[in-house]
């Protein structure tokens, strides 16, 4: 083969390598519970592929929770729960095994929800208490409103490009059964800053928070994972505009909050970065 031919082959090989995704992400969703969660899901389905193209990773979605099995998960480096959690025992076992053997996970808002009695009862102890650490849902603010979020761990790869405080996109915010500050495995990355209070507009008094400590983003040091409490858009439930349950606010498109999600995903996709951080503890 001529030198020119070799050069062409090498160039093509290098070009192919450059286009190879750095890691692969699979996002699971249900898309059936609450118009606000479905609105966020539709956002995510448009936003994540654009982010993936810009940051050289692969992003796929599925609403088939039957894919939560060892064979399917082996194709992916990161799993995302966009709205709900798995309910089938075999799917739960497969997800736990995936995480305990080095898999990575990102969860949004309702994926952390558990309440007995409800359609999503507190019946998965490993996930809600060991993995997430938060236990059951206790209460929430209403309506979805923006909050001032404060960075609690500025050294984490997901937060190191963020200002000390910033204003989030509107969301419904959860209060949890467990105090995450008392859990040594949990690294709280962001919490609601006191300048947010009063947070929520009601109309019920308990839906407006006036004080307290509320984590909204955290990781578990024993796993490659991150949880975001946001992911609930404001909806025209009262049909003041029209009869379509129109979306009144969006989770994505906030530059600072977007940076948090992107950096968190790049961190999850980088196994070496995670290993280095655990080794430095």
Question: What does each model-identified segment do?
Answer:
Residues 18-23, 27, 39, 47-50, ...:
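Extracellular ligand-binding/catalytic regions of CAZymes and related secreted enzymes
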Residues 24-115:
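Helical hinge/lid and interdomain linker segments adjacent to catalytic or ligand-binding clefts
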Residues 140-227:
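Catalytic beta-strand/loop cores that center a nucleophilic Ser/Cys/Thr
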Residues 5-15:
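Bacterial N-terminal signal peptides
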Residues 32-33, 86, 112-114, 193-197, ...:
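Short, solvent-exposed loop/turn segments at secondary-structure junctions
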Residues 85-164:
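A glycine-rich, often tryptophan-bearing local segment used as a flexible ligand/cofactor-contacting loop or short
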């Amino acid at each position: 083969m001529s030198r020119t031919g070799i050069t062409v082959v090498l160039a093509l090989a290098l070009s192919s390598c450059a286009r190879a995704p750095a890691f692969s992400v699979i996002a699971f969703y249900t898309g059936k519970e609450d118009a606000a969660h479905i609105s966020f899901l539709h956002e995510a389905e448009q936003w994540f592929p654009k982010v993936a193209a810009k940051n050289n990773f692969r992003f796929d979605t599925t609403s088939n929770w039957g894919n939560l099995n060892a064979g399917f998960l082996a194709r992916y480096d990161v799993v995302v729960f966009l709205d709900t959690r798995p309910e089938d025992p075999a799917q739960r076992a497969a997800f736990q095994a995936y995480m305990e053997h080095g898999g990575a996970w990102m969860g949004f808002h309702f994926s952390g929800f558990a309440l007995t009695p409800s359609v999503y009862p507190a019946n998965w102890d490993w996930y809600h208490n060991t993995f997430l650490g938060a236990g059951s849902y206790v209460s929430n603010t209403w309506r979805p409103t923006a909050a001032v979020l404060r960075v609690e761990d500025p050294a984490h790869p997901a937060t190191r490009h963020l200002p000390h405080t910033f204003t989030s996109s509107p969301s419904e915010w959860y209060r949890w059964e467990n105090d995450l500050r008392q859990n040594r495995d949990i690294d709280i990355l962001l919490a609601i800053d006191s300048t947010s209070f009063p947070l929520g507009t009601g109309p019920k008094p308990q839906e407006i928070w006036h004080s307290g400590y509320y984590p909204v983003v955290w990781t578990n040091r024993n796993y490659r994972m991150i949880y975001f409490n946001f992911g609930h858009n404001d909806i025209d439930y009262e049909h003041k505009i029209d009869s379509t349950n129109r979306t009144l606010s969006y989770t994505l498109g906030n530059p600072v909050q977007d940076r948090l999600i992107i950096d968190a995903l790049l961190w999850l996709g980088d196994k070496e970065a995670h290993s280095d951080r655990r080794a430095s503890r």
